[in-house]
């Protein structure tokens, strides 16, 4: 009866390190005590163990014999204070003639230490890598020759012997083979299975007690703040939304004061942050600052515009007497979180620190309008060329004397932009004359935002934004900040309904000069006719000289007389005929005078434009603006030859 014997199976249990759940320990302070109990070592010959953590090194008792298995009763305590700490254990075998030999090692990372709870646990000890033995050159040569001879059998018998060698080990290599005395052929011998050696391991009890990190005590003035989508727009340089960031006012009273500013976030907040220290003008008087020029406004801090962003920021700076605006920011746009802002100084009595605005009454009335430049509506920024009147215009009305700041912003900085602010001269109408400028940007520049501050009386004003070059298309935003809670700001689209234009020339005799010259009445003359009405009418008369350098003074007078069929002469002129005139003869491209025509006023007028000096040859245009139908024609000069013939008769 045949029986089948099952092969014997040997099972080896190997303990491996179980990876603990990963903890995000970045930017955390770790303070705690680590207790390590060494209980037992298996499969590793040693005399003693070295246990290291950070800079501390401790040694177990030294065993008398280097047995593979040892029991220990050592307990070690370590201070853990760094996010890169780890526990290192080394097994050493003493050598009384040579250096001691390390027979095993173990490294436990910080994450495993943080989750250790004092339970006994087996950890594998890694064996020290054996040194590679040197092979003599002749052995390598003999081995190569043997391999060559074996690889190429020259006869069938050798091939057969080669096949036998592939199936069986040589007697020198394996004790499981034996040579038969009769045939000389090897035969198999049953041998017991070789026992697998267990991996070396160590049993440890590790307990980690996490201590609360020492609390930072902020001295001086501490202000609490909140970041959210409404007040955090990242780094504010070249950002048109900077005005919405939280601002603090720091006042240094009467001497240079060294201060320390600290920006702190809650523990564990992984958000880089920083702040700017910016000059604060007395103009703002407790209101938030409208930053117009970061180049000149930002105080340099250690050659940086702001302290280097980090999860917490410290800054030491000496400040002269004055006021400074401090703007904290989180690096991620619209980040939500809390923070503390701390000011400390040896001269704290010389400092004042609070959030802006100082009171609700000092909060800005903020009004924003959106606009668009097109090829047809962008006349450029040169006010000496009448194309500027094509630009968009916006009017704001102040109900009292007020502070105002106008900010022009664009979504990028690829266009050179700026604006002018002038007083509105024609109620409810777009400006036709560049006069009574009250403010402007310092220059046209490639920037995301630019603006100016103003202190203005009650009234209506016009903002004229433009690019430096005409015809460029693009979107823009205009924002008015004012302490007048009843102020209004809106696009200005209304214009005069009627515009009449005639062209003329000053040349030769017709270039008669100003009224101070006896030849004044030789200048071209024009007949303006206004229809009868029971309402007051405002008629704007504009004289434009065809010159871009405005090198000649120009002006005109408006006369009322009985007949306008012929040019007025010096002999017929009377002072009572003067209805109005330009205030002066000015060197400018255009000049405007307004006629206030009442129901009882004359309705027909003679207009005589001129240069200031006589004999100046130049062409010109005369334009009349009105909301009623008007007529404007040149009065023909008398034919002098006909007059002389009539006199001869």
Curated annotation (Swiss-Prot):
Transmembrane segments: none
Record-annotated C2 domain positions: 15-123
Enzyme class: hydrolase
Gene3D superfamilies membership: 2.60.120.380, C2 domain
Domain of life of the organism encoding this protein: Eukaryota
Entries under SMART domains matching the protein: calpain_III
Residues of the propeptide: 1-3
Annotated localization: Cytoplasm, Cytosol
Annotated GO MF terms: calcium-dependent cysteine-type endopeptidase activity
One family name in Pfam for this protein: Calpain_III
Residues carrying the site annotation Cleavage: 192-193
Gene Ontology cellular-component annotations: cytosol
Keywords of the record: Autocatalytic cleavage, Cytoplasm, Hydrolase, Protease, Repeat, Thiol protease
Name by which UniProt lists this protein: Putative calpain-like cysteine protease A
Species in which this protein is naturally found: Dictyostelium discoideum (Social amoeba)
Encoding gene, per UniProt annotation: cplA
